[in-house]
Swiss-Prot record:
The keyword DNA damage does not apply. The lineage of its organism: Archaea, Methanobacteriati, Methanobacteriota, Thermococci, Thermococcales. GO terms for biological process: L-tryptophan biosynthetic process. It catalyses: (1S,2R)-1-C-(indol-3-yl)glycerol 3-phosphate + L-serine = D-glyceraldehyde 3-phosphate + L-tryptophan + H2O. Tetramer of two alpha and two beta chains. Pathway: Amino-acid biosynthesis; L-tryptophan biosynthesis; L-tryptophan from chorismate: step 5/5. It holds the Pfam family PALP. This is Tryptophan synthase beta chain 1. Belongs to the TrpB family. It comes from Thermococcus kodakarensis (strain ATCC BAA-918 / JCM 12380 / KOD1) (Pyrococcus kodakaraensis (strain KOD1)). One of its GO terms (cellular component) is cytoplasm. The beta subunit is responsible for the synthesis of L-tryptophan from indole and L-serine.
């Protein structure tokens, strides 16, 4: 794997004008990632501001009810901000600060990454502009309000389908014009190199902690690690420290209303090779290669592609990727809430649902770790509308 590619995936498919900013970012990242002052500062904020390490919790009642493997939950829902997004938000914002940048640009769909960027910007005294499709601004009013409270400016994007992919285009356009003093803070393991590597590294704290915690709790590594996959950062973060171990890595995509309906967001299961957002990966696209609309009950999984390292892990056979439907995810949401007193994000509920599917087929001494990537408060409206399953 050369630096820029994971197998054949990844790369830098960007206009000439972005090559220089990306080079500068790569150089800065390589310099600061081993810099003691940078790492001590990041460590300090992760511990005292964000609340790391997060617990690894044995879901005893759920495990016993299913009657198979032991299910452990990596509690990223307890992180400041309510989801794993904070790890990358503070990591990249601090990197930008060390690079001498004074402004952060982000794009957001469901608003979670926008909130994480706004939080980090407020903490470090940086200006934050968040691009958001006008459609999403309507759908995610609370997160728009939250970003405003944190001092960020939300810029609604009226072009194209007025959703995430249009927000991405606007954010890139802004960065080309302002990179001297702005950093483009990408929210997942996507985009042109070096972003997939940077985001994976900042999220790997999840897997490093989980690995230590399970060895302490059980004296052995898990048999399987399960995480939901949209762009793929929470999954990459928990998978990466286990890649060289004999551990099944299972990514769960949004099956929506079923793959056969076309209403889903499962790029690894149903997508084609393509180039978008500066990278070569799997995308949901039509015959003309245009990105097609996605559907999921969970707004955070509806990215139309997937990070290049996941594409590589799939093609190499190191990880397996499955789908869970809206209905199965909602069922898992209710089951975890009632059995363990934890309301998961609908994204994370996809991973819980798949763990619930495989646990009964496994032995009682086998172990599954589920990355509980976020809490469910933001989804209560949707759950109320959909009703009980």
């Amino acid at each position: 794997m050369d630096d820029m590619f994971f197998g054949r995936f990844g790369g830098q498919f960007v206009p000439e004008t972005l090559i220089e900013p990306l080079k500068k970012l790569e150089r800065a990242y390589k310099k600061f990632k081993d810099d003691p002052e940078f790492n001590e500062t990041l460590e300090y904020y992760l511990r005292n501001w964000a609340g790391r390490p997060t617990p690894l919790y044995y879901a005893e009642r759920l495990s016993k009810k299913l009657g198979g493997a032991k299910i452990y939950l990596k509690r990223e829902d307890l992180l400041h901000g309510g989801a794993h997004k904070t790890n990358n938000g503070i990591g990249q914002a601090l990197l930008a600060k060390f690079m001498g940048k004074e402004r952060l640009i982000a794009e957001t769909g469901a608003g979670q990454h926008g909130v994480a960027t706004a939080m980090a910007g407020a903490l470090l005294g940086m200006k934050v502009d968040v691009y958001m499709g006008a459609e999403d601004v309507e759908r995610q009013k609370m997160n728009v309000f939250r970003m405003g409270l944190l001092g960020a400016r939300v810029i609604p994007v009226e072009s194209g389908s007025r959703t995430l992919k249009d927000a991405i285009n606007e954010a890139l356009r802004d960065w080309v014009a302002t990179f001297e003093y702005s950093h483009y803070l990408i929210g997942s393991v996507v985009g042109p190199y070096p972003y997939p590597v940077i985001v994976r590294d900042f999220q790997s704290v999840i897997g490093r902690e989980a690995r230590e915690q399970i060895l302490e709790a059980e004296g052995t590594l898990p048999d399987a690690v399960v995480a939901c996959v949209g762009g793929g950062s929470n999954a990459m973060g928990i998978f990466y420290p286990f890649v060289n171990d004999r551990v099944r890595l299972i990514g769960v995509e949004a099956g929506g209303k079923g793959l056969e309906t076309g209403l889903h967001a499962a790029s690894l299961n149903a997508g084609e090779l393509g180039v978008f957002h500066g990278m070569l990966s799997y995308f949901l696209q039509n015959e003309e290669g245009q990105i097609t609309p996605t559907h999921s009950v969970s707004a955070g999984l509806d990215y139309p592609g997937v990070g290049p390292e996941h594409a590589y892990l799939k093609d190499s056979g190191r990880a397996e990727y499955v789908t869970v439907t809206d209905e199965e995810a909602l069922r898992a949401f209710h089951e975890l809430s009632r059995t363990e007193g934890i309301l998961p994000a609908l994204e994370s509920a996809h991973a819980v649902a798949y763990a619930m599917k495989i646990a009964p087929e496994m032995d009682k001494d086998e172990i599954i770790i589920v990355n509980l990537s976020g809490r469910g408060d933001k989804d209560l409206d949707i759950v109320r509308r959909v009703g009980n399953v």
